Amino acid sequence: MAAVTMSVSGRKVASRPGPVPEAAQSFLYAPRTPNVGGPGGPQVEWTARRMVWVPSELHGFEAAALRDEGEEEAEVELAESGRRLRLPRDQIQRMNPPKFSKAEDMAELTCLNEASVLHNLRERYYSGLIYTYSGLFCVVINPYKQLPIYTEAIVEMYRGKKRHEVPPHVYAVTEGAYRSMLQDREDQSILCTGESGAGKTENTKKVIQYLAHVASSPKGRKEPGVPASVSTMSYGELERQLLQANPILEAFGNAKTVKNDNSSRFGKFIRINFDIAGYIVGANIETYLLEKSRAIRQAKDECSFHIFYQLLGGAGEQLKADLLLEPCSHYRFLTNGPSSSPGQERELFQETLESLRVLGLLPEEITAMLRTVSAVLQFGNIVLKKERNTDQATMPDNTAAQKLCRLLGLGVTDFSRALLTPRIKVGRDYVQKAQTKEQADFALEALAKATYERLFRWLVLRLNRALDRSPRQGASFLGILDIAGFEIFQLNSFEQLCINYTNEKLQQLFNHTMFVLEQEEYQREGIPWTFLDFGLDLQPCIDLIERPANPPGLLALLDEECWFPKATDKSFVEKVAQEQGSHPKFQRPRNLRDQADFSVLHYAGKVDYKASEWLMKNMDPLNDNVAALLHQSTDRLTAEIWKDVEGIVGLEQVSSLGDGPPGGRPRRGMFRTVGQLYKESLSRLMATLSNTNPSFVRCIVPNHEKRAGKLEPRLVLDQLRCNGVLEGIRICRQGFPNRILFQEFRQRYEILTPNAIPKGFMDGKQACEKMIQALELDPNLYRVGQSKIFFRAGVLAQLEEERDLKVTDIIVSFQAAARGYLARRAFQRRQQQQSALRVMQRNCAAYLKLRNWQWWRLFIKVKPLLQVTRQDEVLQARAQELQKVQELQQQSAREVGELQGRVAQLEEERTRLAEQLRAEAELCSEAEETRARLAARKQELELVVTELEARVGEEEECSRQLQSEKKRLQQHIQELESHLEAEEGARQKLQLEKVTTEAKMKKFEEDLLLLEDQNSKLSKERRLLEERLAEFSSQAAEEEEKVKSLNKLRLKYEATISDMEDRLKKEEKGRQELEKLKRRLDGESSELQEQMVEQKQRAEELLAQLGRKEDELQAALLRAEEEGGARAQLLKSLREAQAGLAEAQEDLEAERVARAKAEKQRRDLGEELEALRGELEDTLDSTNAQQELRSKREQEVTELKKALEEESRAHEVSMQELRQRHSQALVEMAEQLEQARRGKGVWEKTRLSLEAEVSELKAELSSLQTSRQEGEQKRRRLESQLQEVQGRSSDSERARSEAAEKLQRAQAELESVSTALSEAESKAIRLGKELSSAESQLHDTQELLQEETRAKLALGSRVRALEAEAAGLREQMEEEVVARERAGRELQSTQAQLSEWRRRQEEEAAVLEAGEEARRRAAREAETLTQRLAEKTEAVERLERARRRLQQELDDATVDLGQQKQLLSTLEKKQRKFDQLLAEEKAAVLRAVEDRERIEAEGREREARALSLTRALEEEQEAREELERQNRALRAELEALLSSKDDVGKNVHELERARKAAEQAASDLRTQVTELEDELTAAEDAKLRLEVTVQALKAQHERDLQGRDDAGEERRRQLAKQLRDAEVERDEERKQRALAMAARKKLELELEELKAQTSAAGQGKEEAVKQLKKMQVQMKELWREVEETRSSRDEMFTLSRENEKKLKGLEAEVLRLQEELAASDRARRQAQQDRDEMAEEVASGNLSKAATLEEKRQLEGRLSQLEEELEEEQNNSELLKDHYRKLVLQVESLTTELSAERSFSAKAESGRQQLERQIQELRARLGEEDAGARARQKMLIAALESKLAQAEEQLEQESRERILSGKLVRRAEKRLKEVVLQVDEERRVADQVRDQLEKSNLRLKQLKRQLEEAEEEASRAQAGRRRLQRELEDVTESAESMNREVTTLRNRLRRGPLTFTTRTVRQVFRLEEGVASDEEEAEGAEPGSAPGQEPEAPPPATPQ
């Protein structure tokens, strides 16, 4: 047995199976790089330069050559720039050899590192290869363009192929999962993961497309051979519906985002069910977390769901009218426009409708869906406003509400009432509650979101109903997961948390599947394996989100906060920070300015979350009134999707639509939040995925710009790190990814080792080991476990190829044996036939001998006569027997037919029964096993249930105890309440204690209610457990029938049990809490009992006091009556105060009304003023009317002013009266309060004498106290109201003064406007009569004047502001001078204190210096220690990195060593085979060269032969023509013979000669025909040999061309890249050239316009003559205008001079302030100097210390004051500096404004000069006009020439610019030519290659054409030969007939005169017609015509 050899990687490079479209080849196969290891190749360079990868900021990693290598650092030289760097060795990564460039599987790379993986992906991506294998999964990079690799030809290419036989593709992954499902009978799943915009949705669609094509039922498949594209693939109905479900889901669930134009805003899991044969029998779609908030609100540059834009852009006019649609911009919910054009939206909308129809939706359902979509948009158009006096929301315009109600089938009134004033339940009653605007808006948005989400869920259920036809027929399923990718925005919300949580779980599943389960299986199987920890455990982050308790995660905390009524988002964030603050994956915001509330460290990076409205999103509340209306809608769809809202309060039951039919009603009390529902659905999804065999497709985003052909290395590296690509490749290389059971391995591969295992050997493990030994596999390539055998990557694929080869050899041998057997049997049959023929020949020969023998004849005649007599009888008997036999035969035939049918039926029944029996046996065995497992599981569950029941019993007992305790406490409470009621009338203290006790009792009742609720929950959970137990039992019964789904439900039960255990733990925890609460209640009840004992004691004491007080009752009655009178008087005064307060409030309200009226009048006045201004500007011609209107307005203004003054006076009078009234009320209240105080004192003095009515007196006293407090509060309230009134009066006074000021300003503005109006009117009247040119210039002058006026006003205001600031500065300077003098006076008293202060300061400085020195020394030591520690830490980290790197390199080296050993053995074997093949190939090449030369020589010979044959055929043609001529001559002679009988003899002789000549020609033609046939056979033989040789040469030539094509393809790509760059530059230059051409055209147009103006000026000359007189009249007006302009200019100059003077004054003031500031600085310095001198004097006077201690203290205080004053002075100086800087800035601004004014005045002066010049020109033109028309014409011509000169100058300038642009264009063209030359050079090289290819193809075609010509010539020669033969026979026959005629004529001539009959003439003419027809057939005969169609010879003419 030959050993099985393995390749390096265990995987062959994918060959090209079958014909692949040329357009797709470059996107599937990597181009071959010939001569990799040749001289100068990349392999030599890689080996010589020691190429490595080094980090790069731009490219991620950059190629470099290793120059020097040290222990820690190495020197490298960058390959691109040649720059040298020194880097740490751990930053340098090895480079793979060039032969691994663009590897299809990155597990094949010898150097596995980030740089190599990134380089391989980048090279493949730039080559258009987007799919790459990475070990066991596939990596796909989004190309952002359409690729031709998804056609039907590509699908057929991947169909039935193994992974290593075809290039990487998502089709290959799908095919592998599909085949694994069919072979292993295990459910599969394909998980497309990646970030948003990576291409997950598109790959999911391709997977479904492939499965629909491959696994479609036979009835839906096409006939083979019928071509079809992807769009026209014909499927079955179910497959077509499955494909059409995607456009519907994309329309309703996808939207445009910043990262992706077709982003899935929901997750989906598509489950495709297959039967046993592998055909699709159904499908099911599960969706997760639709982003419903996108329907009402979108971020910037993002859009809503596609269906909105498709509906608005694609609906017809009738549909728009039915759905009440409006343009997109009219909807508030659509903030951004559509992402595509209206035409595309229309096409997409029609596609969506067609998909809905394909899936079986009725037209009514489709219309109802679109109606609901339109209604969602109408929700946003409802506008609500706030009422003026209240916060209640109103709907002023209900148009949108009417549209909404019409679409949803609601009543407008009911909808408005339910929205604005919903009914809420308060106690047992329902009340109407007014909603605020914010609450109503929120309710509208919540309803819109809920409506769209419910519509989406209904649509998914409808699709599942159409797809899931027969759920029980599915044997297995294949699931495709497409869920939203990881999202990291600037601020992320609750939706992003759910999406990222899902991706965390999926990545954890990937890590667990790839790294943990894989290694655990190695350990279970006993394989020697060291567990590798890749550090990719994401469980901490998942626990942070989903952990239920200890500590609770984010979702649990969010649910907990949702239960508290006063909880907010802020409290949630605080609780999260408190519970999870120390979690390693949780971070708080480091900066207070951060907008994020917290951050989570996900596997893809840090994500900042903003917890805004998280509680509302989690609870998802709805307006119950509107929801109930929607449930009762008349629209069927609306009522159906809102079916489950009945009974829901506060929270939306989201699960009802997701898990059951739309009409299912949720259980009451089960309030489920969005987070809980999503967590449960995600748990179900993960359980489903964990039960399947997952296949991962990792989608990568190349860039965020969505540009094709661009790859950002950093972005791709981050995604590769997050996805665990390197770890997956490493475990694929180091591990054993392929495994197979012993029995299956033996059954499948025993064919490779036929004699290795003895017969009857049963041990599977030993059998596999014997097979492995026979296969001679390297021990490093496999491991033998306990039940399986494990292989490295690619080994099983190699064994599979060897098995295929072996099976192929066996089949070939079997076919050879079968063909030999058939050939031998045919040969035996031929031999039998030959012997039979010999016998027949012998008998025939004997018969021939006997037939002429007379006795034999006699015997033959006599013998039948002997049996004649018996013959009839025998015949009759035989006839009867024959009839009987025939009847029997027919009967037996019928019986046999019936029996055969019965046998066939029984056979079918037997096979069916056998198959059923076998299936039943299998099912029975499996069911028995399953029943046993279920029985065991049932026992376990029963134990669990009994335990739960016991616990529930304990809980019930506890609840009963609590109930009894509750009753006891209630009785005790009743006793306490009765006792307290008895004591309440006696003492106020007992009343207060009763209130506190009642509060405690209420608290106890609430606690008891909580306990009851918990008890009810426990009972409900118990019932739930019982229901689940019943469900489990029923499911167990069903599971005995359903064999397939047992393994799936097992894990589901385990998950349920784990949930039960969690719930039991929660119940135990709750029970413990209840016990704690019980103990606390017991303690509190004991305390209450003690308190009650104390209260009883107090009550007894009070009763004793009551007995003592009974004697004093009578004396207290009189005093009580007096107190009642005082109280009545106090109440009366209180009522009077309240009346005064009411009057004050009424006055205040009147004041408010008056103020509002004044404000309204002021606004009306302002509006009338604005209207007046507008009317003044609009009516410039009606000056008198405007004057009257202005006077009228002034009168109104004065009247308003008077009215305002009167109102202010009235207001002052009313305020004075109010003050007096209030003061009187205060006096009265003070007197009353004084009386009350006196009454209180009397009552207190006489309190000891009260006996009888103690309780009543105390009650009255308490009422008096409360009334007093109320009076005090009212007094304070009145005082505060009085203050408010005073403040409001001051405000109104201020407002009145402001209104007066505004009126004054308005009057001033009115006056200025009136003056400006009069000026504008005069100017407008004058300017209206001027020429158009003068109008424009004067208009400019007016604008300049207005700007100068505005500038003057602004300057004046700024000057006033500067003056005010200067005054402020003066005051500050005076204050500073005063402060400085005060400081100087106080400074003298500080000298003694300064010495002591200095001494203390010096001592403290010495102490501080010593401490500072110690601190510096300690800091230096700490710094050195820190530095040492950092160095040690860095060294340790460096050593750790080096250790990890060396460990990794050691692992790689170990793997590489094993592979190299295997490679070495393989290469040695291959080398030997290659040497042998090389020798054979060389010999074959030599033989092929010789054959080619020989064939070329033969070809040349054939060409010569063909030419000679052509010439021979031409000669034959000439001979035939000659014969035809002879025929015609003979026919002419025959006619002459018939016409002339005298010349008969001569004709006979001539005919005889002609016959001989024809016979000679016929014999020559026969010889030529035989020669041509011989040559034709030789030519055919040569053609066959030539075809064989040409095929060999063609194959060799195609191989050569393939190599050249690959090299040319690589070169072509480089050229294409350069060409693209050149095209980009060329486009830029084209744009510049287009701009230049546009400018040129513009100039040309302007030139043409100037020419047209020139011609128009000639025509306008006459009009100028006509207007001359008008101009003379207008000249005077122009002079007046010029004079006015001059006067205004003079005024401007005077104003500017005044401004300059003011500016100079300000500058002088600034200088003076600067001098004062300098003087103050000098004074300050002098004061400091004096202070220093005084300090010295204090130091000298230190001897008299004892006497001056008091002075010292005073000086110290003074010194502190001086220091404070000094600080104030410094602050003042700083303020002065600031003021100075502001002044400098203002001076600068004034300077700029002055310069601007000067420029304006200069412009005005230039305008005036221009006007003067124009006037002079007009005067000159007037003189010239007076001189003559000719002079005027010359002036016009001169003016036009000047304009033309200007135009020419402009044109010249434009021409210069055009020349410059032309230079740029020429430069660009030159560069373009260089690029084009370079491209042409490259193209020339490619053309040379192409020419060589075309020459070879032409040579091949020429040879083929020569062969075809030779064949055609041979066929023509054969046809000519046949034709000549036929003609020869015709001529021969005609000659014979002529001879017969001649002989006949001769005989007749001899007998007598010749007489011709009609028959003779007819025969002669028939002969002529026959000859003519022969000629026609000879002329029209085809080369390939059959020679059998010959005309019959005419019969010889016989005499009548």
UniProtKB/Swiss-Prot annotation:
Query: Residue ranges of region Actin-binding?
Result: 682-704
Which residue ranges does the record assign to the Myosin N-terminal SH3-like domain? 47-97
Observed phenotype of the null mutant? Survival to adulthood with no obvious defects in brain structure, lung and heart development and no evidence for defective cell division. Deletion in animals expressing only 12% of wild-type amounts of Myh10 results in an increase in cardiac myocyte hypertrophy and interstitial fibrosis compared with the Myh10 hypomorphic animal.
Residues with the modification Phosphoserine, per the entry, are S56, S925, S1249, S1280, S1973, S1985
| Gene Ontology BP term (one) | actin filament-based movement
**What ranges does the record list as Acidic residues composition bias?**
1971-1980
Region of interest called Disordered, as start-end residue ranges on this chain: 1173-1197, 1260-1311, 1597-1629, 1720-1751, 1910-1942, 1967-2000
Q: Which InterPro entries does UniProt cross-reference here?
A: IQ_motif_EF-hand-BS, Kinesin_motor_dom_sf, Myosin_head_motor_dom-like, Myosin_N, Myosin_S1_N, Myosin_tail, P-loop_NTPase
Q: Which residues form a coiled coil?
A: 866-1951
Q: Which residues, renumbered to this chain, carry the PTM N-acetylalanine?
A: A2
Q: Residue spans with biased composition (Basic and acidic residues)?
A: 1290-1304, 1720-1732
Q: Which Pfam family would be a valid example here?
A: Myosin_head
Q: What family does this chain come from, according to its entry?
A: Belongs to the TRAFAC class myosin-kinesin ATPase superfamily. Myosin family.
Fill in the domain comment.
The rodlike tail sequence is highly repetitive, showing cycles of a 28-residue repeat pattern composed of 4 heptapeptides, characteristic for alpha-helical coiled coils.
Name it. Myosin-14
